[in-house]
From Swiss-Prot:
Positions contributing to substrate binding: N89, M90, E91
Described purpose of this protein according to its UniProt entry: This enzyme scavenges exogenous and endogenous cytidine and 2'-deoxycytidine for UMP synthesis.
Gene expressing this chain: cdd
Entry cofactors: Zn(2+)
Name of this chain's protein: Cytidine deaminase
Lineage: Bacteria, Pseudomonadati, Pseudomonadota, Gammaproteobacteria, Enterobacterales
EC number: 3.5.4.5
Annotated source species: Salmonella typhimurium (strain LT2 / SGSC1412 / ATCC 700720)
GO molecular function: cytidine deaminase activity; identical protein binding; zinc ion binding
Keyword Metal-binding in record: yes
Reactions the enzyme catalyzes: cytidine + H2O + H(+) = uridine + NH4(+); 2'-deoxycytidine + H2O + H(+) = 2'-deoxyuridine + NH4(+)
Residues reported in the UniProt entry to bind Zn(2+): H102, C129, C132
Amino acid sequence: MHPRFQTAFAQLADNLQSALAPILADHHFPAMLTAEQVSTLKNTAGLDEDALAFALLPLAAACARTDLSHFNVGAIARGVSGNWYFGANMEFLGATMQQTVHAEQSAISHAWLRGEKGLAAVTVNYTPCGHCRQFMNELNSGLDLRIHLPGRAPHTLRDYLPDAFGPKDLEIKTLLMDEQDHGFTLTGDTLTQAAITAANKSHMPYSHSPSGVALECKDGRIFTGSYAENAAFNPTLPPLQGALNLLSLNGYDYADIQRAILAEKGDAALIQWDATAATLKALGCHNIDRVLLG
């Protein structure tokens, strides 16, 4: 078990500990539960779906990287597939505050990058900030997405974001988590192809500036992130943050990164290179390359 989970795990009910122990045994537990695992945990612990999600929130919050605020937020995105995806807030010392990833963004990006097609609910241990409410409004679940908070009745995003502005106001039909493939040809080595594949998945209906990042760890593991734009622009999630989020959720540290590649168009309206390189260098990675999409 990764050390970050030990305190939260020790506070769980005994029957839930017994069911979770073999799942968490892997140091690189992927911070997600399959639909089958969720069903097993519910039956073993005698909890309904909502109660189980609340019980697991401390494990999600344990994944937070909060060197600046020391305020851990955890979230669980519940996919329409039945799979659950952990998320937690991330802060990057030496970079800018704008690079921060919020817990809801973390869980949603986690689900999206693992191929989830839509979300039924998000469970989070603190009220979503306005930034996250706007981020969630980009999803194909729209304002019907259920939001669950401890000690409160469940509400929809519509309740938390009245008079919402979103992609439909801009006549955008393809939403975040809808399947997309922009068709750029895969070239180069495995890491380069992974970055291009991530760029092909980008949600960028406003700038038409696709981008993707691939990070290679010293053990050969590769994590990718795709660009996710937002109708309100500022809640947009850059591709590097998506990749760093997956890397961290899987129990890796920034020091494990040995190489990074950004794939983007050289003539795009928005360029990720400077911000991507600056953030990676702040985290200790200097082996950074860029491949231009044709």
